[in-house]
């Protein structure tokens, strides 16, 4: 027999369903993601910290879960909201069902609700503060928790999810035929700032010959320069970039030293912020694996994976910055490059996981940039 569960929004809307994870109470910003698959990668993506993730596809959990698909060493999403979870997964790689995986990792989750109705609310009203409660239900307590949540705006979550110690990374992507991780001969020394980095980003860099040192978000610039890097990578991550003054200070120095820079997601916003641009909170953000983005230089349209609730305000970019990519959903900025130094960034996720690989050429561009600089 399943336990009851509820989702309560800050506007007072209550959804009743069944618990499909751990019992308890969890609060966060309620967002929706349109990906059909990749639920495990989504939940373990540090960019989803303090977010209650609604998956719009009705059947979630069909392929179970496997340790190889984690994007971090824990679940970072605050909770999961779905329409239906199958009783039995079917996939040759599956090690455990989604429900058991959620329970084992202490994730509060709800199934059996009208996710279409919820998504319409989020589209019309914007991302909502919410509370998930499973097991012993107290609607008033859940509603109070939802309304007391202060929101992600103004929260510096990069230093919360970041690694506490520097480490090296050499592992490439998974070779499914051999069931082993690929390796490549290291050619370029790259320091990756961990603002909430996904493992597949590190794998794609390592596979292209990057000798990676991953450092905490607040690592002083002098410690990084002492490693004599050929390039610096600015990772994805959760929260608002505005409070991350420590990151802006470091990036300014790398720009002055002309160290090649590549940023993704939060790293993109931090690069833009460093050169003087403003970053604004979006109404409901971009979360999904089917977002069309146009390369303004070639005119090519690429389908991309997206996960962000803030966007760079193009009108505030200085004259020495060129806009390279733009969303075809809402026209928001998706990429920039500095004209006078070797630095560029992309708002979406070229590493996918989950999603298409249309934009993985950006990793190759970073390699080419370091080769030219050296």
From Swiss-Prot:
The protein's name in its UniProt record: Carbamoyl phosphate synthase small chain
Active site: 265 (nucleophile), 349, 351
UniProt xrefs under SMART domains: CPSase_sm_chain
Binding of L-glutamine, residues: 47, 237, 239, 266, 269, 307, 309-310
EC number(s) per entry: 6.3.5.5
Region CPSase: start-end pairs: 1-186
First-tier enzyme category under EC: ligase
Originating species: Xylella fastidiosa (strain 9a5c)
Reaction(s) catalysed by this chain's protein: hydrogencarbonate + L-glutamine + 2 ATP + H2O = carbamoyl phosphate + L-glutamate + 2 ADP + phosphate + 2 H(+)
Pfam families xref list: CPSase_sm_chain (PF00988), GATase (PF00117)
Family to which the UniProt record says this protein belongs: Belongs to the CarA family.
Molecular function per GO: ATP binding; carbamoyl-phosphate synthase (glutamine-hydrolyzing) activity; glutaminase activity
Summary of subunit composition and partner proteins: Composed of two chains; the small (or glutamine) chain promotes the hydrolysis of glutamine to ammonia, which is used by the large (or ammonia) chain to synthesize carbamoyl phosphate. Tetramer of heterodimers (alpha,beta)4.
Keywords, sorted A to Z: Amino-acid biosynthesis, Arginine biosynthesis, ATP-binding, Glutamine amidotransferase, Ligase, Nucleotide-binding, Pyrimidine biosynthesis
Keyword Acetylation: no
HAMAP family named in the record: CPSase_S_chain
Any GO BP: 'de novo' UMP biosynthetic process
Function: Small subunit of the glutamine-dependent carbamoyl phosphate synthetase (CPSase). CPSase catalyzes the formation of carbamoyl phosphate from the ammonia moiety of glutamine, carbonate, and phosphate donated by ATP, constituting the first step of 2 biosynthetic pathways, one leading to arginine and/or urea and the other to pyrimidine nucleotides. The small subunit (glutamine amidotransferase) binds and cleaves glutamine to supply the large subunit with the substrate ammonia.
Residues annotated as domain Glutamine amidotransferase type-1: 189-374
Pathway: Amino-acid biosynthesis; L-arginine biosynthesis; carbamoyl phosphate from bicarbonate: step 1/1; Pyrimidine metabolism; UMP biosynthesis via de novo pathway; (S)-dihydroorotate from bicarbonate: step 1/3
């Amino acid at each position: 027999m399943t336990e009851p569960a509820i989702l309560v929004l800050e506007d007072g809307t209550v959804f009743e369903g069944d618990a499909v994870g751990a019992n308890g109470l969890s609060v966060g910003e309620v967002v929706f993601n349109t990906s059909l698959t990749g639920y495990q990668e989504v939940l373990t993506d540090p960019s989803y910290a303090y977010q209650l993730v609604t998956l719009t596809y009705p059947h979630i959990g069909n392929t179970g879960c496997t340790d190889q698909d984690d994007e971090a060493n824990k679940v970072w999403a605050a909770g999961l909201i779905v329409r239906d979870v199958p009783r039995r997964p079917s996939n040759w790689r599956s090690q455990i069902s989604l429900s058991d995986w959620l329970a084992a990792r202490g994730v509060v989750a709800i199934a059996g609700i009208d996710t279409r109705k919820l998504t319409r609310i989020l589209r019309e009203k914007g991302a909502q503060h919410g509370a998930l409660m499973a097991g012993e239900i107290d609607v008033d307590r859940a509603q109070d928790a939802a309304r007391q949540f202060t929101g992600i705006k103004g929260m510096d979550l990069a230093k919360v999810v970041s690694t506490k110690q520097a480490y090296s990374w050499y592992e490439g992507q998974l070779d499914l035929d051999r069931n082993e991780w690929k390796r490549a001969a290291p050619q370029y020394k790259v320091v990756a700032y961990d603002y909430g980095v996904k493992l597949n980003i590190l794998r794609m860099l390592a596979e292209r010959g990057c000798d990676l040192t991953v450092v905490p978000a607040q690592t002083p610039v002098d410690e990084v320069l002492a490693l004599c890097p050929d390039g610096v990578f600015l990772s994805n991550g959760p929260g608002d970039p505005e409070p991350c003054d420590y990151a802006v200070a470091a990036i300014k120095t790398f720009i002055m030293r002309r160290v090649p820079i590549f940023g993704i997601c939060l790293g993109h916003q931090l690069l833009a912020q460093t050169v003087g641009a403003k970053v604004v909170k979006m109404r409901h953000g971009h979360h999904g694996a089917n977002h069309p983005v146009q390369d303004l230089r070639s005119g090519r349209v690429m389908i991309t994976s997206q996960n962000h609730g803030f966007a760079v305000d193009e009108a505030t970019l200085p004259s020495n910055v060129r806009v390279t990519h733009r969303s075809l959903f809402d026209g928001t900025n998706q990429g920039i490059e500095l004209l006078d130094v070797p630095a560029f960034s992309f708002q979406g996720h070229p590493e996918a996981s989950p999603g298409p690989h249309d934009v993985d050429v950006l990793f190759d561009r970073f390699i080419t940039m370091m080769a030219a600089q050296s």
